[in-house]
Amino acid sequence: MYSIAISTISNRIETLDLTPYDDIQYVIVHQETHQASPDAVKALSARPDVIYVPLDKKGLSVSRNTALANATGDYVLIMDDDVTFSIDAIHALHDHFKEDDIDVATYYHKFTNGKTTLKKQSAYNHHLLNIANPSSIDICIKNESLLKSNIQFDESFGLGAQYPSGEEMIFLADCLKFGLKVKRYPLEICTHPPVTSGADFFTTKQKILAKAAMFNRIYSKFGRLLFILFVLKKTPKVCQAGYGKFFILNAISSLIERK
């Protein structure tokens, strides 16, 4: 059994398209429930393949953790309310879990405009220096390993939190630090609209601070150095977007503030 952990908010729950499958359980965590149609909520709650969890707390990571706590499937896939998935790709992923005896798998996703995040055609093991690329919707966890490790998303990071990004990279880092086996596979599990929040890490001071805090959270005493290298690498791209000076000044400010 696979648990599809979906975070949704407000009336977005009304647009969910949840195809029934014999081996799929949907765990829907719903924030700002008062803005949704009661009929839509009632219809979903009545389905035997749906676990509906209303949540009155804020934050995407809080929602993710609530979904993980309520999932009862053997494997839990993190997803959003604007994502669709391939059941055949999930079955292929299950084979990899069995063959490689892994605890956490990451993969890739397509976009509705036909583009893809799939860049590498071979599988590889994750370590602390190659976990930056997977999005939350590219993560599947063996539930047994999750319960054993008690790892959660850091609720200080993610949309609606103090730091609005970085939660998925921190989650993978915590898995690795615990000793879980984490591997990436050349599978496209999900399809997502082409606009993603992770692509914008530079248009506000808080987004830049979040990157600095993330590097510090994961790499401790090496975090400052790795953040500086990140800034140097990304500056040309940010300059093309017209935020070069803003990005650099706030990156420097974040380093000073975190002394």
Where would I find each of the regions flagged by the language model?
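Non-catalytic, C-terminal membrane-associated alpha-helical segments of glycosyltransferases
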Residues: F202-K259
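Catalytic beta-strand/loop signature of glycosyltransferases that borders the donor
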Residues: F153-E155, G179-T191, T203-T204
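Conserved donor NDP-sugar-binding/catalytic core segment of glycosyltransferases
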Residues: D88-K119
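Acidic donor-binding segment of Leloir-type glycosyltransferases
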Residues: I13-P54
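Short aromatic/hydrophobic "clamp" motif used to bind/position activated sugar donors
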Residues: V76
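Acidic donor-binding loop at a coil-to-helix junction in glycosyltransferase catalytic cores
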Residues: G158-I170
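Glycine-rich, basic loop-to-helix element that forms the pyrophosphate-binding segment
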Residues: L55-A71
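The conserved acidic donor/metal-binding loop of glycosyltransferases
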Residues: D80-T84
